[in-house]
């Protein structure tokens, strides 16, 4: 629920769904589509490796070569997979009772929100962006890409750039940020959301 009570709860006491999407390209309003969603649960201050969601999605359109170079998901790999309209209800159920966690999560949320009318699936959960939280914890750092945040915090992951491994990297970054945020007096979900809003958007 998006109830006010969650806002007063300590970050360490909440349940999260860390997630990432891979897409055909970078322009959701220009018709780009999600081709993979990967997510995993974070609870009691740790990753839940058995509680994951991973789906390939047929976008019904070609994948841009630049995007293919990043995620390695080809047209052949997604052809005949379920359409987004079939996957989003399942994903929504998976993350229903949790705070959504992503790195530059605004990008992923735009892709989800643009589908609201067509699918009737509305993601109204609280959200936290590890990119913004990394900028709060490291105000003098210039770069806050997922790679930069991983380097800063000593997080390593086996395979980068599948949606699920990026979700796992995001979750690990988040858990490493918690004590650094606490040092800055940021303990509750509400405080983390407020601190994120005050940050100028880093590059």
Describe the predicted segments one by one.
Residues 1-10, 171, 175-203:
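Acidic two-metal-ion nuclease catalytic site recognized across multiple nuclease folds
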Residues 132-135, 151, 172-175:
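Generic alpha-helical structural context detector
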Residues 88-90, 170-173:
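Short secondary-structure transition/capping segments
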Residues 166:
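Conserved catalytic/binding loops enriched for acidic/polar residues
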């Amino acid at each position: 629920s998006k109830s006010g009570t969650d806002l007063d709860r300590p970050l360490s006491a909440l349940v999260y769904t860390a997630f990432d999407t891979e897409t055909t390209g970078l322009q959701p309003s220009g018709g780009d589509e999600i081709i993979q969603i990967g997510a995993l649960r974070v609870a009691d201050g740790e990753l839940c490796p058995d509680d994951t969601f991973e789906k390939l999605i047929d976008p019904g359109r070609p994948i841009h070569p630049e995007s293919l170079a990043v995620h390695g998901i080809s047209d052949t790999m997604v052809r005949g997979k379920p359409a987004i309209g079939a996957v989003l209800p399942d994903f929504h159920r998976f993350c229903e009772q949790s705070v959504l966690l992503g790195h530059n999560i605004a990008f992923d949320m735009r892709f989800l929100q643009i589908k609201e009318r067509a699918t009737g699936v509305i993601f109204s959960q609280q959200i936290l962006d590890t990119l913004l939280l990394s900028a709060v914890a490291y105000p003098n750092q210039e770069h806050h890409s997922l790679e930069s945040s991983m380097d800063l915090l000593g997080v390593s992951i086996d395979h980068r750039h599948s949606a699920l491994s990026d979700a796992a990297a995001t979750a690990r970054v988040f858990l490493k940020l918690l004590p650094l945020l606490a040092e800055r007096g940021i303990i509750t979900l509400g405080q983390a959301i407020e601190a994120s809003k005050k940050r100028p958007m880093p590059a």
